[in-house]
Amino acid sequence: MPLRPGDASSSASTASNRSRTRTRYRTKAMNSEVDESLFGGVKPSSQGKSDSPIVVIHDKHAIRKTLSALGLEHKTETIQLITRDMVRELIVPTEDPSGESLIISPEEFERIKWASQVLTKEELNAREQALKKEKEGILEAVTIRKKIMKQKEMTWNNNKKLSDLEEVARERAQNLLQRADKLRMEQEEELKDMSKIILNAKCHAIRDAQILEKQQIQKELDEEERRLDHMMEIDRRESLQRQEDRERKRREERVRGKRHIVEQIKKNEEERSLQAEHREQEKEQMLAYLDRLQEEDLQDLERRHQEKLKMQAEIKRINDENQRQKAEMLAQERLADQMVMEFTKKKMAREAEYEAEQEKIRREKEKEIARLRALQEKAQDYQAEQDALRAKRNQEVADREWRRKEKENAQKKIETEEKLRKSRLEQVAFKEHTLAVQVQRDRDEFERILRAQREQIEREKQEQEKKAKGCLQHANELRRQVRENQQKHVQNRLATFEEGRRLKEEAEKRRERIEDIKKQKLEELRATGLPEKYCIEVERKANILPATSVN
């Protein structure tokens, strides 16, 4: 449907208004290039038309000029397309009426003509023979030129005295040639096997050295552990010795304290006996007075008897309370004594028996004192009883202090043993961590070496496959050459014989050269300081033999 001018102007204004609010059109390229062969060309007139649908374009510009002059130039049909943001003209594509035309260049046409020629087997063989003879002639000419150039160069070198710089350059060139020859020889299969054997021997040597180093480290760790165990044992024995010394001093102090208490008791008994004698004398002096005051004394004795009963009840209550506290303390001490060693328990048991015996003796003495106090009539009996009770309390205080110190020492010993146990666990954990790190390093190193060996084996395998393919192709070529050589003259057979002899000499020289290089590599391996057993193993695997002369 054709567009009106008004519609075009309105659409253009609308497009311009919208283009202000939207992104403007981006220019991708200032010009465009199109392959004109894609659109075809004008067909030639019926006078020059042939049966072939192929049209060869010799000169596009000349054809276009001719058609323009004759008024036969094809005019393209276009359509104007107006969109919101731009106006474009589109070319209507044309079609070939026959649908059989094909436009190609002259070069392509010549190539198709040349490829369309079908040669017979004899022509192919003749072409191959001609190409082969041409190659052989070229190679022979090149060989002759090389020989002539070498002879001229040798003559020139022999006749000319070299300068210092030229001598250095010649030595450098010879060194480069030797290096190139060495690198070329390194590509031989035997030397590759030799290098692989040497690398394997070095890997084994490194692995054995790592194993020895690991064993040495383990040995040092074991020695260090034994030394620490010995130090801990010495420390434990010294601690036990100090503990025994403290026990001995404590027992001596207890014995001295008990001896002092016994001496005080004996002294008090002597004083009481003296007082008893003195009282007897007073009794004798006061018999008259006692007779007179007998009634009063009986009342007073009854009162004192009641007081004594009360006092005995109070003493019994105090003794029961002391026994109960002592039983509780003994229970606590037994609970604490369970955490110490067995020999301490036995000592405490013996001391408990000794204390029980002393307690029994003390009770017997108290009974005796009570009996003597019952016979006495004065207040001094109560004082003696108070002295005995005070001595008993002092003994109990000393016992409690001793048990407290024992408990503190046992607690300190338990804390020391706990610290030693923690230190031991930390040492074991550190040793396990060090060993795990060393094992991980060894594993990583082994995996790296194994990965490198695998990569090298894969590369060698690929090279062997390539070489096998090359050998197969070479063998096929040799078989073809043998068949051709069988058809040649006897002179060619003689030349083949000479070539075989030369190849044999070269193979023998190559073998000798390889053997020399193997021996040189073995000497270099020995010079690196590798143990002799690995060198012998490399020599055995490489089959290094003495060089033999060529007859």
UniProtKB/Swiss-Prot annotation:
Disruption outcome: Knockout animals display left-right asymmetry abnormalities, including situs inversus totalis. Nodal cilia rotational speed is reduced compared to heterozyous littermates. Mutant males also exhibit asthenospermia and are infertile.
Transmembrane segments annotated in the record for this chain: none
GO molecular-function term, one example from the UniProt record: AMP binding
Complex and partners: Microtubule inner protein component of sperm flagellar doublet microtubules. Interacts with AK8; dimerization with AK8 may create a cavity at the interface of the dimer that can accommodate AMP. Interacts with CFAP52. Interacts with ENKUR. Directly interacts with DNALI1. Interacts with DNAH11. Interacts with DNAI1.
Chief place where the protein resides: cytoplasm
Compositionally skewed regions (Low complexity) per UniProt: 8-18
Name the UniProt record assigns to this protein: Cilia- and flagella-associated protein 45
Family: Belongs to the CFAP45 family.
Coiled-coil stretches: 276-524
Classification lineage: Eukaryota, Metazoa, Chordata, Craniata, Vertebrata
Cellular location(s): Cytoplasm, Cytoskeleton, Cilium axoneme; Cytoplasm, Cytoskeleton, Flagellum axoneme; Cell projection, Cilium; Cell projection, Cilium, Flagellum
Chain intervals with Basic and acidic residues compositional bias: 387-415
